[in-house]
Regions:
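Flexible, low-complexity junctional segments that flank or bridge functional domains
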Residues: 2-5, 10, 18-283, 290-292, ...
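C-terminal "post-core" interaction segments
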Residues: 95, 242-487
């Protein structure tokens, strides 16, 4: 069975084998959410397959388990049964499941397909674990495969599907129909083409042929009642790296997500900036605003281009193979020139890994607002019929050993949002209900604070100007001393 790790996020992806699963060489794919390419949930389409229905097969297996008279069945109230081992299958609980399964098959007022029952059962197993563990149907699983290629047909928005199936916008992707139509981080999509979210199949209705029209109904804090936004779907080719010169000697690189080619593209565009500056930059602004994450390996590659040595990130989980560490290989491409990392409340997962790595190594100063706080790693486990399970398998830690789960990264220099970009609402309102710490059932963070103040989205050019001003302050000082700072 091939494992496809994801970081999603809402997006942090890393290949992490699970105990007891046959392993193949892991491939380097996607993140975790999005209608587009990166992070924790999104729309997608995949061709139907002739694979046998998992429900019937699993149902038969469950029945076999109950008819084996020789199999020991622990009592439901036997404490030793629960403590016997974390990986032991609770046969008594499975018997209860089979009884309910049989009752539904034999007596429910309408016929129910095995696949529907099994899919619901699997969703139920994952529902209360954490917001990022989920059952992925064929279309949703196909979306993850599209995420690393950065090409798909849709509206271009990163989404998080909540337990009530509602869709929260993590961030619109730069230059896409969603961004042009005015979709904002923190928006709640309550209907698609007039149909309530509860009546549609996940995020799939957001996908469709390029040129077709879709209408989404949005609820936004600070606005009176729902409102509609109409947009035409496009073939979304997400360019994850863009760059330009802000002023002579001062470069700017925008990373919108982390895809398979992000590391190579970053290196190429950094070299172009260096060439424009006679081989040496006075400083660099690295813009990670509204970057929902993506491939962990891509974030590691970008960090490695800016570090001579030191740890970049480590991951730790229950399975031994979940414990990994990534170190810089040497060769700072900027030769110590100062770096400012620009973040906001939409910076999540792999984006937080990069920001944390550069700051903990005293290589950059972080400017902006508090980040999302997604410090977990997801692994995608294919089920053999086109469906998959996305399971949280590890937490990641910055070089200082700190987990940002449900706490985020607090910048060295905090900026306030321009109210005109968030409908005149007070700072922090737009993303208040979509940060990791307020997601129902989120993993408790090591440094999580009750009632902490979440960050804000920081759209527009003003934050870039503020980052450049900070960069100029640093430019006349040794990079290490200038970049020092902490939470």
């Amino acid at each position: 069975m091939r494992r496809i790790p994801v970081l999603l996020p809402f997006l942090l992806l890393v290949a992490l084998p699970c105990a007891g699963l046959a392993q193949e060489a892991p491939r380097d794919p996607p993140p975790a959410a999005s209608e587009a390419a990166p992070q924790d949930a999104e729309e997608g389409t995949a061709p139907a397959t002739d694979a046998p229905e998992a429900g019937a097969e699993a149902g038969d297996a469950a029945e076999d388990a109950t008819t084996d008279e020789d199999a020991p069945v622990p009592a439901a109230d036997d404490p030793d049964a629960a403590d016997a081992g974390d990986t032991k299958v609770p046969l008594a609980e499975i018997q209860r499941y089979v009884l309910v399964y049989r009752a539904i098959k034999e007596a429910y007022v309408d016929a129910v397909q095995d696949r529907e029952l099994m899919e619901s059962a699997i969703r139920g197993l994952l529902l209360d674990l954490d917001p990022h563990s989920a059952y992925l149907g064929k279309s949703e699983a196909a979306t993850l495969d599209e995420q690393t290629s950065g090409a798909y047909e849709g509206i271009g928005v990163e989404l998080l599907q909540q337990q009530d199936r509602s869709l929260k916008v993590v961030a619109p992707i730069d230059g896409t129909p969603a961004a042009r139509a005015g979709v904002l981080a923190g928006d709640l999509i309550v209907a698609i083409d007039g149909k309530p979210i509860a009546q549609v199949e996940g995020m799939e209705p957001l996908r469709g042929p390029a040129g077709s029209t879709v209408v989404i109904t949005i609820v936004r804090e600070g606005r009176d009642g729902p409102f509609d936004l109409s947009m035409q779907r496009e073939t979304i080719r997400v360019t994850s790296v863009r760059s330009r010169m802000l002023e002579p000697g001062y470069g700017y690189v925008r990373l919108s997500t982390f895809q398979a080619d992000t590391g190579a593209d970053f290196r190429q565009q950094l070299d172009e900036l260096l060439a424009q500056s006679g081989g040496r930059l006075r400083g660099l602004v690295l813009d990670l605003r509204s970057n929902p994450g993506g491939l962990l390996t891509a974030a590691v590659q970008v960090a490695d281009e800016l570090l001579d040595s030191g740890a970049i990130v480590s991951t730790r989980g229950r399975a031994p193979a979940s414990d990994t560490r990534f170190d810089a290989t040497g060769g700072d491409r900027l030769q110590g020139a100062p770096v400012v990392v620009l973040v906001d409340a939409g910076s999540a997962s792999a984006a937080e890994v990069l920001a944390g790595a550069l700051r903990d190594n005293d290589r950059a100063r972080v400017v902006g607002s508090r980040t999302f706080g997604k410090g977990s790693v997801q692994t995608v486990l294919p089920l053999g019929n086109g469906d998959s399970v996305k399971l949280t398998t590890a937490r990641y830690y910055t070089p200082s050993g700190r987990s940002i789960q449900a706490s985020g990264i607090v910048p060295d220099v905090e900026l306030q949002p321009d109210p005109k970009y968030i409908g005149g609402t007070p700072p922090a309102t737009a993303l208040r209900t979509v940060t990791e710490a307020v997601l129902p059932g989120h993993l408790r963070g090591d440094e999580e604070e009750d009632g902490y103040q979440p960050g804000s989205p920081l759209p527009g050019d003003a934050p870039v100007s503020a980052a450049l001003a900070e960069l100029k302050k640093m430019a006349g000082k040794p990079a290490t001393a200038a970049a020092a700072g902490g939470d």
